[in-house]
A protein has these predicted regions:
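N-terminal secretory signal peptides
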Residues: 1-2, 207-211
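N-terminal secretory signal peptides and thylakoid transit peptides that target proteins
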Residues: 1-15
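C-terminal segment of N-terminal export signals and the immediately downstream linker at the start
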Residues: 21-51, 57-63
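A short, well-structured beta->alpha microelement
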Residues: 27-35, 65-88
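Structural motif
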Residues: 47-52, 72-74, 95-102
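Short, charged/polar "capping" segments at the starts of alpha-helices
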Residues: 52-57, 79-80, 103-107
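Short, aromatic/basic amphipathic alpha-helical patches
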Residues: 56-64, 106-114
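Ser/Thr/Gly-rich flexible loops in soluble cytosolic domains mediating phosphotransfer, phosphorylation
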Residues: 76-81, 110-163
Length: 211
């Protein structure tokens, strides 16, 4: 288990490390079947940041799906030491969330010590005029499904379902989707939020895709 000193150092590093993600070409897919409502692995926690309304919306949908929700205010210390570290020390389990960069930075690095990796990452940049740009990378089926679900103004709800249905495979893709924001969520527009799934790195074999 990382010490408290290591935890603080990771948090400080997260505040100064620059973050840059290239804008990817849209994933090419003719038609996308509706992905399963439940993932092949059970999410043990969905981490949501109460400071952001979009993240609050994710928490509401996660609770509706019966997933354990963890509410933070940017500080994951209590969650890590009291809940997640004891679980990961015995049985590394997948978690997901919509947070600022700092919590993801720390949890990703703690996951490395337990054989977990970020298997899905979304960067959500808020733009003027009520729009949001979603830059996504992860399993192909999840990325392909995002094209039909994240364009609407209820994207936090749809995002929660994508996170819950994210199955780890070697077959990956990246894309950028531009959507809209509900008026009551626009207070998040000065922030860039990150969605993510951290899961065991072992993946299902890649399968061939039809052209």
């Amino acid at each position: 288990m990382p010490s408290r000193r290591e935890f603080i150092q990771a948090g400080l590093a997260a505040s100064v490390v620059p973050v840059a993600f290239p804008v990817a070409e849209p994933a090419r897919v003719a038609s996308v079947p509706n992905i399963a409502a439940l993932s092949s692995h059970r999410l043990t926690h969905v981490v949501c940041d109460a400071r952001f309304r979009c993240s609050q919306a994710v928490a509401i949908e996660a609770a509706r799906l019966g997933l354990p929700v963890v509410s933070i205010d940017g500080d994951i210390s209590d969650f890590w030491f009291n809940d997640l570290a004891p679980v990961w020390s015995t049985s590394p389990r997948p978690i997901a969330g919509l947070t600022a960069h700092g919590p993801l930075f720390c949890l990703e690095r703690f996951g490395w010590d337990h054989g977990l990796r970020v298997v899905f990452r979304g960067v959500h940049r808020f733009e003027d005029g009520g729009h949001v740009e979603h830059s996504l990378a992860g399993p192909f089926r999840t990325i392909a499904a995002a094209h039909g679900t994240l364009v609407s103004d209820d994207w936090p709800t749809q995002l929660t379902r994508l996170l819950n249905s994210c199955a780890v495979t070697h077959d990956t893709a990246s894309t950028t989707v531009r959507g809209v924001i509900e008026s009551e969520l626009e207070r998040d527009s000065d922030d860039t939020l990150f969605s993510w799934v951290i899961a065991p790195k072992h993946a299902e074999p890649a399968t061939a895709r039809r052209a």
